[in-house]
């Protein structure tokens, strides 16, 4: 009699955002993701704002999306949010060809990544 709803994949005090097809290698993206893991969201946003890595702008957008999901979709308090998880996965690899000397060719790999950020609401000990 109708479709049953799927259970939430994250806990009730969590929200997440996912960004796919990021044009950078997972290794480089993981350096920026490690920068924000376990931090309060205000501190993580500040760190990403002043990071010199090119990809930090897209990570910041994804973190802002996770914060907006927490506030609007799950009714969480944004002042008590912490980045509980930030993990990186591999996506496709575009393969290109570069002509070299004497009729040879070299392979160029252009990797893509994906990023998932989970924010959790924590009670602050007073």
UniProtKB/Swiss-Prot annotation:
Q: Which GO biological-process labels does this protein carry?
A: translation
Tell me which CDD domains the record gives: Ribosomal_L22 (cd00336)
Q: Which SUPFAM superfamilies match?
A: Ribosomal protein L22
Q: Does the keyword Transmembrane helix apply?
A: no
- Which Gene3D superfamilies does the record associate with it? Ribosomal protein L22/L17 (3.90.470.10)
| Keyword field contains RNA-binding | yes
A Pfam cross-reference name: Ribosomal_L22
Q: What does the record give under GO molecular function?
A: rRNA binding; structural constituent of ribosome
Belongs to which family?
Belongs to the universal ribosomal protein uL22 family.
PANTHER family noted in UniProt: CHLOROPLAST 50S RIBOSOMAL PROTEIN L22-RELATED (PTHR13501), LARGE RIBOSOMAL SUBUNIT PROTEIN UL22M (PTHR13501:SF8)
General function of this protein: This protein binds specifically to 23S rRNA; its binding is stimulated by other ribosomal proteins, e.g. L4, L17, and L20. It is important during the early stages of 50S assembly. It makes multiple contacts with different domains of the 23S rRNA in the assembled 50S subunit and ribosome. The globular domain of the protein is located near the polypeptide exit tunnel on the outside of the subunit, while an extended beta-hairpin is found that lines the wall of the exit tunnel in the center of the 70S ribosome.
Oligomeric and partner information: Part of the 50S ribosomal subunit.
Name of this protein: Large ribosomal subunit protein uL22
Source species: Maricaulis maris (strain MCS10)
């Amino acid at each position: 009699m109708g479709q049953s709803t799927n259970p939430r994949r994250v806990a009730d005090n969590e929200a997440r955002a996912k960004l796919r097809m990021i044009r950078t290698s997972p290794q480089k993206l993981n350096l920026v993701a490690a920068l924000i893991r376990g931090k309060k969201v205000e501190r993580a946003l500040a760190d990403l704002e002043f990071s010199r890595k090119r990809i930090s702008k897209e990570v910041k957008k994804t973190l802002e999306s996770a914060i907006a999901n927490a506030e609007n979709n799950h009714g969480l308090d944004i002042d008590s949010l912490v980045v509980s998880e930030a993990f990186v996965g591999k996506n496709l690899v575009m393969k290109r060809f570069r002509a070299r000397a004497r009729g040879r060719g070299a392979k160029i790999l252009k990797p893509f990544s994906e990023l998932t950020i989970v924010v959790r609401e924590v009670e602050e000990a007073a």
